[in-house]
């Protein structure tokens, strides 16, 4: 018989764990003594719900980062397999490599043929090592664009799922052209004729995210993050102290709410109370409903109109000031 997995608690969730332990203790005593304490249990459960709502309504950027990295947060493959009517993974960059940090393939969403792809983190330590913790190599980005071009050739919309700390920054990655591979993807994704919807499901880290992140719509889960660099790296660069990562997380404006205010994302996807890992089925339904709605809107536009709007969307990003000569 399968045993229930022990929950993985984050630091800010410990008060909730203490309250849950108290509820279980009352239940156990009630069973032992044969006493009806349903009113007391109901009150404690209400307190637990209120406390959970209070905690998750006031999360700091650093706490949202912890949720985005939660080991049990649904992955790209989890979402693809859950929202697809059919799914067939495709492999290889046609240059001799097949990076497992990027998964890609053809699928059906609500009966419509689409291409789905994204970074894939491991489900355990061994799998994480095999998938390089979701950090793609140049081969991964070349595989991604090959399959996106396949989608464009056959008129299939493209759905990308972003979940990576960053692109792989090893010496071999540089030797094989990491910067060129990402830059090529950026250019080519602007040229594609089909609708493109990108969704940040966990971590959206730096150029690693951008390599599959050019689209007509950019969606983001409520507790996902999107940044120019991991907060730890930013803190190490600016203050020579990785312990200042929480301060960097505040300064980087990594949360969905911040990015929506800045006009960088199009929609925040609400998560079940406690995060997507608490109720993956609920999170999947939210994602699927949104993707279908956006696909319907984008399919009503002509290809030239979509491409122009995609281009202008990215041209509007960023703020700069210019002083008088």
From Swiss-Prot:
It holds the Pfam family ACCA. GO terms for molecular function: acetyl-CoA carboxylase activity; ATP binding; carboxyl- or carbamoyltransferase activity. It is an enzyme of class 2 (transferase). It is found in: Cytoplasm. One of its GO terms (cellular component) is acetyl-CoA carboxylase complex. Residues 43-297 form the CoA carboxyltransferase C-terminal domain. GO terms for biological process: fatty acid biosynthetic process; malonyl-CoA biosynthetic process. Keywords: ATP-binding, Cytoplasm, Fatty acid biosynthesis, Fatty acid metabolism, Lipid biosynthesis, Lipid metabolism, Nucleotide-binding, Transferase. The keyword Transferase applies. Belongs to the AccA family. It comes from Cyanothece sp. (strain PCC 7425 / ATCC 29141). Component of the acetyl coenzyme A carboxylase (ACC) complex. First, biotin carboxylase catalyzes the carboxylation of biotin on its carrier protein (BCCP) and then the CO(2) group is transferred by the carboxyltransferase to acetyl-CoA to form malonyl-CoA. Acetyl-CoA carboxylase is a heterohexamer composed of biotin carboxyl carrier protein (AccB), biotin carboxylase (AccC) and two subunits each of ACCase subunit alpha (AccA) and ACCase subunit beta (AccD). Coiled coil: none annotated. The lineage of its organism: Bacteria, Bacillati, Cyanobacteriota, Cyanophyceae, Gomontiellales. Its main location: cytoplasm. It catalyses: N(6)-carboxybiotinyl-L-lysyl-[protein] + acetyl-CoA = N(6)-biotinyl-L-lysyl-[protein] + malonyl-CoA. Its EC number is 2.1.3.15. This is Acetyl-coenzyme A carboxylase carboxyl transferase subunit alpha. InterPro entries: Acetyl_CoA_COase_a_su, ClpP/crotonase-like_dom_sf, COA_CT_C. Pathway: Lipid metabolism; malonyl-CoA biosynthesis; malonyl-CoA from acetyl-CoA: step 1/1.
């Amino acid at each position: 018989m399968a045993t229930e997995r022990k929950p993985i608690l984050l630091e800010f969730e410990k008060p909730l764990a203490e309250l849950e332990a108290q509820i279980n203790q009352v239940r156990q005593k009630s069973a032992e003594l044969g006493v009806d304490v349903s009113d007391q249990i109901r009150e404690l459960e209400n307190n637990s719900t209120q406390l959970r709502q209070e905690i998750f309504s006031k999360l700091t950027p650093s706490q949202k980062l912890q949720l985005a990295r939660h080991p049990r947060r649904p992955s790209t493959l989890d979402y693809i397999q859950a929202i697809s009517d059919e799914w067939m993974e495709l492999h290889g960059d046609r240059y001799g490599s097949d990076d497992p940090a990027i998964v890609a393939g053809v699928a059906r969403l609500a009966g419509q043929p689409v291409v789905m792809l994204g970074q894939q983190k491991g489900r355990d330590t061994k799998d994480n090592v095999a998938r390089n913790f979701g950090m793609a190599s140049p081969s991964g980005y070349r595989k991604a664009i090959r399959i996106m071009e396949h989608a464009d050739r056959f008129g299939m919309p493209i759905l990308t799922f972003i979940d990576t700390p960053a692109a792989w920054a090893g010496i071999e990655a540089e030797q094989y052209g990491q910067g060129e591979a990402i830059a090529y993807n950026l250019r080519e994704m602007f040229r594609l004729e089909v609708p493109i919807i990108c969704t940040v499901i966990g971590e959206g880290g730096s150029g690693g995210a951008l390599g599959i992140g050019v689209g007509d719509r950019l969606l983001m889960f409520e507790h996902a993050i999107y940044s120019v660099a991991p907060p730890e790296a930013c803190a190490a660069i600016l203050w020579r102290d990785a312990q200042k990562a929480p301060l960097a997380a505040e300064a980087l404006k990594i949360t969905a709410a911040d990015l929506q205010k800045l006009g960088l994302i199009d929609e925040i996807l609400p998560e079940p109370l406690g995060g997507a890992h608490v109720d993956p089925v609920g999170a999947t339904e939210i994602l699927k409903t949104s993707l279908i709605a956006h696909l319907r809107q984008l399919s009503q536009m002509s290809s030239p109109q979509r491409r122009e709007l995609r281009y202008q969307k990215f041209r509007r990003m960023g703020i700069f000031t210019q002083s008088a000569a």
